[in-house]
From Swiss-Prot:
Subcellular location: Nucleus
PROSITE patterns per UniProt: MADS_BOX_1, MADS_BOX_2
GO molecular function: DNA-binding transcription factor activity; DNA-binding transcription factor activity, RNA polymerase II-specific; protein dimerization activity; RNA polymerase II cis-regulatory region sequence-specific DNA binding
Low complexity bias (residue ranges): 128-205, 222-245, 301-334, 347-392, 401-440
Disulphides: none
Chain ranges of the MADS-box domain: 36-96
Species: Dictyostelium discoideum
Polar residues bias spans: 1-15, 442-467
Biased composition annotated in UniProt, kind: Basic and acidic residues: 206-220
Gene3D superfamilies: Transcription factor, MADS-box
Protein name (Swiss-Prot/TrEMBL): Serum response factor homolog B
GO cellular component terms given for this protein: nucleus
Residue ranges, annotated region (Disordered): 1-38, 115-245, 301-467
Keywords tagged on the record: DNA-binding, Nucleus, Transcription, Transcription regulation
């Protein structure tokens, strides 16, 4: 609703604006004496405990124009909303306008600007600021916890040298708490400033909606105050952000160091595992090479002992009992008949039991056995060092003989050219081609094949001549 305000520019003493018929009864709007064509009006300040009366001149700032305009909207009462030079907003109304504040038509007009108990000065923006305070406090509590944890974690790292090592934990915790408390205070101060700014902005919005003709000087001062408050708020916010950034950085640094240490530990574990696997592979290769070498040695031993299995000397009992050295020693050195029987018997008895433990043959033993002409037991010892003890097995159809042959040995006649030739030594035997030993008949022929169940790999030494 637009009114022609020019009709109130020149108000005489006998003129009356649209006020109540009896101003003394209806309100505090009273006529004053005429002074140079100007009319002054006393308006009561509603909401102030002192209930001050402020007088304004209608020609000074045009407030009367707004009073008349508002009176047409709310009845015969007068409502004024004035912004002071300090940026505060005052609401003025006649006494009978006060009940209209609770009504819907009055609420929609003045609820954002009138500071009364019925309408508390809390706006949506203020609510948001309160929520902001809560969020800031929550952040500060989180910072307290994080900073304390940081100090506790780094007490041993020399971060508290300035405290001379006295009560490092407590000093750090206290300093962290104090910093956080300061942050809380700064946040609260910022929010209070924001609340004031929001109130000012709301009041300015109300003034714009109600089209109040506030002087430009006051508007500019309000803007300056708002700008100053905004600058202060920005500075405080920046300071708070800096206070928050440093604890976060202090937390991130140990976390990064822990991650790097864990990665290094994992790399070390992987390197150790690879080294262990390499050692295992090397050990397996070494075992394979050792097995291969042992197999080669065993093959060589078998090749050496295999030759002794042949009845190259034609002397069956000597080969069967004493074995390996027949190829090298017994071809040219055939002992007498009776001595060979005794030596082969003793050799198989004494050396056969222990020969199982010796799987490798040293060919040097041939020389040793050949030189011990006077020791019958040396034959059995050398037989123990032969390749396989299985060569000392007696024929299956033979019973174990007694240690010493009880039968008398036959006499040994002189050699004769007509006798059968044994071996390569030129020695001739006058006996028949077969002989009896424990009931076992064996042909005595040079070219007769050896029985498969007679031991072949025992050692035969040169028979002593004086036995």
């Amino acid at each position: 609703m637009e009114l022609n305000m020019n009709q109130y520019d020149n108000i005489e003493s006998n003129d009356s604006p649209p006020t109540p018929s009896s101003p003394g009864e209806e309100g505090n709007v009273e006529k004053k004496e005429k002074k140079s064509g100007r009319r002054k009006i006393n308006i009561e300040f509603i909401g102030d405990k002192s209930r001050r009366h402020i007088t304004f001149s209608k020609r000074k700032s045009g407030i009367m124009k707004k009073a008349y305009e508002l009176s047409t909207l709310t009845g015969t009462q007068v409502l004024l909303i004035v912004a002071s030079e300090t940026g505060h907003v005052y609401t003025f109304a006649t006494p009978k306008l006060q009940p209209l504040i609770t009504k819907q038509e009055g609420k929609t007009l003045i609820q954002a600007c009138l500071n009364t108990p019925d309408v508390p000065p809390v706006s949506k923006d203020d609510g948001n600021n309160n929520n902001g305070n809560n969020s800031n406090n929550n952040n500060n509590s989180n910072n307290n916890n994080s900073s304390n944890n940081n100090n506790n974690g780094n007490n041993n790292n020399g971060n508290t040298n300035n405290n001379n090592g006295n009560n490092n934990n407590s000093n750090n915790n206290n300093s962290g708490n104090n910093n956080n408390n300061n942050n809380n205070n700064s946040y609260n101060n910022n929010n209070n400033n924001n609340n004031n700014n929001n109130n000012n902005n709301n009041n300015n919005n109300c003034k714009e909606e109600q089209n109040m003709n506030i002087p430009n000087e006051r508007k500019s001062k309000n803007n300056i105050n708002n700008n100053n408050n905004n600058q202060n708020n920005n500075q405080n916010n920046n300071q708070n952000n800096n206070n928050l950034t440093q604890p976060i950085q202090n937390l991130q640094l140990p976390l990064q160091q822990n991650i790097i240490a864990q990665q290094q530990q994992q790399l070390n574990q992987q390197a150790a595992l690879q080294q262990q696997m390499t050692q295992q592979i090397d050990q397996k290769l070494y075992n394979l090479q050792l097995q291969q070498q042992q197999m080669q040695q065993q093959q060589q031993i078998q090749n050496i002992s295999g030759g002794s299995g042949n009845n190259s000397n034609g002397y069956i009992n000597g080969n069967g009992m004493n074995g390996n050295n027949n190829n090298n020693n017994n071809s040219n050195n055939i002992p007498e008949y009776g001595q060979v029987i005794i030596q082969s018997y003793r050799g198989s008895n004494s050396g056969g039991n222990n020969s199982s433990n010796n799987t490798s043959t040293n060919t040097n033993t041939n020389t040793n056995t050949n030189t011990n002409n006077n020791n019958n037991n040396s034959n059995s010892s050398n037989g123990n060092n032969s390749n396989n003890n299985s060569n000392n097995i007696l024929p299956q159809n033979l019973t174990t003989p007694s240690p010493i042959i009880s039968q008398p040995l036959p006499s040994i006649p002189s050699p004769s050219s007509s006798s059968s030739n044994i071996g390569n030594s030129g020695y001739s035997s006058p006996f028949s081609t077969s002989f009896s030993y424990g009931g076992y008949q064996q042909p005595f022929s040079r070219n007769y094949p050896l029985q498969s169940n007679i031991a072949t790999n025992s050692t035969v030494s040169k028979a002593p001549s004086d036995l």
